[in-house]
From Swiss-Prot:
Compartments where located: Spore core
Gene: tlp
Source taxon at top rank: Bacteria
Family per similarity comment: Belongs to the Tlp family.
Protein's recorded name: Small, acid-soluble spore protein Tlp
Nucleotidyltransferase found in the keyword field: no
HAMAP family in alphabetical order: Tlp
Organism listed in the record: Geobacillus kaustophilus (strain HTA426)
Length: 75
């Protein structure tokens, strides 16, 4: 039976930062498309962007946690 791989957290901060950047870009693209959307679609886009903002806040908190763990020698 193969042994499970050890938990490698060494690049979590970088991965999370990339995810934050991608989410910000998705928000910007969605806002650009709103001008062509119906009022109903605009509200859906606004709601989705609010959820994206919440996700960004959670990812940034996780970045802080991962950076602190890295500083204290956890890998």
């Amino acid at each position: 039976m193969p042994r499970p791989k050890p938990d490698d957290r060494s690049d979590n901060v970088e991965k999370l930062q990339e995810m934050v950047q991608n989410t910000i870009e998705n928000i910007q693209k969605a806002e650009e498309t709103m001008q062509f959307a119906s009022p109903e679609e605009q509200e859906k886009i606004r709601a989705k962007n609010r959820r994206r903002e919440e996700a960004i806040a959670a990812m940034r908190a996780e970045i802080r946690d991962e950076a602190a763990a890295r500083e204290h020698g956890c890998q």
